[in-house]
Amino acid sequence: MSTFTFNSELQQESESAYRNWLSDNPTGFVVNTLKHSKGLGNRTDARFTRIHRVTCKSINPHKRKKNTTGFTTGRYQKIGALSLDEACNEAMRTSGLKTIKFCPCV
């Protein structure tokens, strides 16, 4: 499995590492999930856990018109995956959910 977690509490340079990963993996997927998920599959996890394509402007600073930061430094962490199956499996493992919501970009 090839997943990569980008979390400012775990990596000092998570924001630049995330941007580099997005550039290097244009056909990949990103799980957007809360940093402090306990993996219990609760309503908060269901509400905030989503899978996006790397090309989605809501999770990709390269796709926005203005320079935006804070993709990995706020409440959320990003998990990069090379395939949709890997993204789904990691999202379920991290959140404890049985099903994961997809952004319309997927």
Enumerate the predicted regions with their spans.
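Mature, structured domains enriched in cysteine- and short glycine motifs
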Residues: 2-106
